[in-house]
């Protein structure tokens, strides 16, 4: 199942695409794969013959005239892999390449998961802030109502103070939510290798969540994990 099939929210897909293109860790992993591919190619070339060219020239005089002749010879030689040195090097390079590819896949998988987690966290924080704002307005209305009732002797100071305490508590909660949103946006911007900015996102009602993944990981599925495959390649 590809990440596009798992995460179908268009705005989230756009963020993931940006992350896959710009993330520094993933680009480093790509360079590791390219280096491993170059090493494997070098070991394969070791099986080819080494070529040599020999050039000779002579000058002979005959009846006052000088005749020049040139000869170019080519030779080829193979290094005998008597002790399996070349074969071992090739196998090691192939294992290193597979390990690098598994590492790149592990980085990519973690990157996609982190971006998605941050995205849905922001959507939930937005929903929480909307609810808190509405609740705050309701309590402010309650305070005004209780103060009006107090003036006509139908409420007391304790009720007003309790309502005001609830207002202050909600105001503090909203500050905390805004701070969490800012911190999450900054962290996600860093992952995307972009300056800190407001992250475009769907609201919680519109956000498309992936289907629930069943709990429990069979051994066959565990062996397909990129980080597990990388460890296997490094131990090979």
Regions found by a protein language model. Give the residues of each.
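A short structural micro-motif
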Residues: 35-39, 167-170
């Amino acid at each position: 199942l590809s990440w596009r099939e798992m995460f179908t929210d268009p705005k989230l897909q756009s963020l993931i695409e940006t992350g896959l293109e710009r993330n520094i860790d993933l680009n480093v992993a790509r360079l590791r794969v390219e280096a491993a591919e170059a090493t494997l190619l070098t070991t394969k070339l070791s099986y080819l013959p080494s070529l040599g060219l020999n050039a000779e020239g002579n000058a002979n005089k005959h009846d006052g005239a000088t005749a020049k002749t040139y000869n170019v010879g080519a030779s080829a030689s193979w290094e005998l892999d008597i002790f399996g040195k070349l074969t071992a090097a090739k196998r090691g390079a192939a294992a290193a390449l597979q390990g690098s590819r598994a590492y790149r896949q592990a980085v990519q998988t973690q990157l996609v998961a982190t971006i998605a987690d941050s995205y849905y966290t922001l959507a939930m924080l937005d929903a929480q802030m909307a609810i808190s704002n509405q609740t705050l307005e309701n309590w402010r209305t309650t305070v005004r109502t209780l103060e009006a009732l107090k003036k006509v002797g139908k409420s007391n100071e304790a009720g007003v103070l309790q309502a005001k305490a609830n207002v202050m508590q909600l105001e503090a909660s909203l500050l905390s939510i805004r701070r969490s949103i800012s911190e999450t946006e900054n962290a996600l911007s860093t992952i995307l290798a972009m300056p800190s900015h407001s992250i475009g996102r769907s609201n919680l009602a519109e956000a498309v969540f992936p289907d629930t993944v069943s709990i429990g990981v069979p051994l066959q599925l565990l062996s397909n994990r990129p980080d597990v495959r990388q460890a296997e390649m490094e131990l090979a």
